[in-house]
Amino acid sequence: MALYEHVFLARQDITPQQVDALVEQYKGVLEANGGKVGRVENWGLKSLTYRIKKNRKAHYVLMDIDAPAPAVHEVERQMRINEDILRYMTIAVEKHEEGPSAMMQKRDRDDRPRRDGDRPDRGGFGDRGPRPDRGDRDDRPRRPREDRA
């Protein structure tokens, strides 16, 4: 059997429980056709780069699949029919990655400083420093005006 990574995007207006039900439905299809589902990662509701079928957000789900090609084709056929699925992509891989995917690692980064001023290396002005005093304008002579006729 071949190894696949399968990602699908579900509509924004369905609940997370309905997304889990979709995952279970497609797991059942794969197992009925002789396949197995390894890791399932729900990446949550994320903004789309562009609108897809009038949706600006979507639920992202990653599934690691070990199944024969006909089982994968059946899952893709059912996803084409389902109106809750906006997009899907199946990629054949040599082996499945261990641990969390890159998207989950990005979410788990707690060592990054927050953007709300939690950066000790900068003052309150970013990296510019304090603003110079602008009280020197009264010391300069006014420029002569040229009257235009």
UniProtKB/Swiss-Prot annotation:
GO terms for biological process: translation. CDD domains: bS6. One of its GO terms (cellular component) is cytosolic small ribosomal subunit. Residues 94-149 are annotated as: Disordered. InterPro entries: Ribosomal_bS6, Ribosomal_bS6_sf, Ribosomal_S6_plastid/chlpt, Transl_elong_EF1B/ribsomal_bS6. Binds together with bS18 to 16S ribosomal RNA. Belongs to the bacterial ribosomal protein bS6 family. The gene is rpsF. It comes from Sinorhizobium fredii (strain NBRC 101917 / NGR234). This is Small ribosomal subunit protein bS6. Transmembrane segments: none annotated. One of its GO terms (molecular function) is small ribosomal subunit rRNA binding.
